[in-house]
């Protein structure tokens, strides 16, 4: 008789929901910023990841809070704030792997949506669409962990400024 072992459950990441939690676009001086700017603005981008364990079993909310400011000659041209989140269910995943998945893989899943919202918001604000560069979350988390001696649950803030 052949002994059959119970098949090991495979690790699984399920995206249960994605949504905009907060969105703000400020254009403080549209006449001057849309018609009188002659040089390329300086773009500053800050990104923060917030991870919250939800009451449901193995469910987590991962938020990307993004702030983008454009300035020219020390005058603010526009400012965008986007908080975009996803609900993720992690099944059969070790605690060590959860930290990596929640701080790297989940943000990688929702970041393209943040990028699209920023692009569309700047375009609808009268500017050229602003395409935020790809972010290597694994590299940033690695650098953050080295600097912070690995916190219990990673809550990094990144300055991912691109000079445009």
Swiss-Prot record:
One Pfam family in the UniProt entry: SecB
Gene designation: secB
Gene Ontology molecular function, alphabetical: unfolded protein binding
GO biological process, one term: protein folding
Function noted in UniProt: One of the proteins required for the normal export of preproteins out of the cell cytoplasm. It is a molecular chaperone that binds to a subset of precursor proteins, maintaining them in a translocation-competent state. It also specifically binds to its receptor SecA.
Protein name: Protein-export protein SecB
Family: Belongs to the SecB family.
Organism, as annotated: Orientia tsutsugamushi (strain Ikeda) (Rickettsia tsutsugamushi)
Entry keywords, A to Z: Chaperone, Cytoplasm, Protein transport, Translocation, Transport
InterPro entries xref list: SecB, SecB-like_sf
PANTHER family: PROTEIN-EXPORT PROTEIN SECB, PTHR36918
Location in the cell: Cytoplasm
Stretch forming the signal peptide: none
Quaternary data: Homotetramer, a dimer of dimers. One homotetramer interacts with 1 SecA dimer.
């Amino acid at each position: 008789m052949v002994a059959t072992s119970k098949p090991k459950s495979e690790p699984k990441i399920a995206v249960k929901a994605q949504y905009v939690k907060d969105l703000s676009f400020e254009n403080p001086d549209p006449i001057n910023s849309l018609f009188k700017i002659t040089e390329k603005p300086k773009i500053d981008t800050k990104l923060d990841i917030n991870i919250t364990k939800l009451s449901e079993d193995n469910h987590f909310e991962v938020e990307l809070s993004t702030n983008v400011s454009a300035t020219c000659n020390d005058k603010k041209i526009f400012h965008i704030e986007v908080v975009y989140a996803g609900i993720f269910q992690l099944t059969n995943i070790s605690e060590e792997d959860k930290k990596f998945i929640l701080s790297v893989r989940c943000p990688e899943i929702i970041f393209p949506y943040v990028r699209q919202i920023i692009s569309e918001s700047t375009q609808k604000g009268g500017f050229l669409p602003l395409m935020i560069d790809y972010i290597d979350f694994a590299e940033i988390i690695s650098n953050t962990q080295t600097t912070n001696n690995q916190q219990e649950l990673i809550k990094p803030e990144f300055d991912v400024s691109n000079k445009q």
